[in-house]
């Protein structure tokens, strides 16, 4: 699953990234049923995807369920691989990829959690009706990346491990400035 009409929807409604990022976080403000006042999906991360990317929703759902079964934090994040370049880290050269997405990223994944999160207005060229991002810098540490895709009319998956790095603030800003920083 992917939202095949994503670009068309951008002309019809504001970006939903901020709401999706909050819903994809276990610790979030309560959302109540207007009829009963009952808190909906309390202490649960609701996997979200807001991209046309093939199988993005399926990947988020499978990952969320797997993490819960393993007793791990169930929040998931969809990222685009923007670019990569060498960087000197601890006296040796590492190739550092920039993963970035405007929304659906839970504050749980950010340095400082909610304190490290910000929302920026989506650029008018992408979302004329507005809407906010949910932005932050990823916590350093081990990550698992995955993608699910269709090849030769069959569903396939790739999985891997990587490490999110703590870069100096000025390097983080420089890398953000090379893309759409919002």
Residue ranges of predicted features:
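Anaerobic metallocofactor- and corrinoid-dependent redox/one-carbon enzyme cores
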Residues: 2-182
